[in-house]
Amino acid sequence: LTEWKELTAEDIVIIPAFGTTVEIEKRLKMIGIEPKEYNTTCPFVEKVWNTSKKLGKNKFSVVIHGKHAHEETKATFSHTTANSPSVIVRNMEETQFLTEVISGHKSSEDFYAFFNGKYSVGFDPDKDLERIGVVNQTTMLATETQEIADLVKQSVIQKYGVDNYQNNFADTRDTLCY
């Protein structure tokens, strides 16, 4: 790999299929390299980003099912946090903990300790978990993401009622990559 200090506007940088962070795109532009010119980001990854953006515009927070240290999840988190509060969950165990925060059985302090390094700056569990959509790192199992979304949905139904949950839970099944 080439060091950042060695890059010039004449260099070609190829963005991999899982995308890159907003911060890296900005850094490339500052050097004079247009990241979109050699962008091989998978369309399914971009669909997740676009869905996250739409969720943010509709005042939903985003739960990202993924491995927080994976490059695709880092890129998705970066793109998502530009538009909405976000938190990363790895599995059903972490999602169960999240639902306990949603239900009020766990506190904000519990949330911050448990999800340390996995939520966006300024995330407020007391308000940012009122309206939620779930997206995923596209290389995660679609069935597991659906189980996670279903668990979050059930938690929202328990809190807001079956007649009102659609105001608080966004159906994002169309972002799953099979």
Task: State where each predicted segment sits.
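The feature marks the mature, well-folded catalytic cores of soluble enzymes
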Residues: 1-178
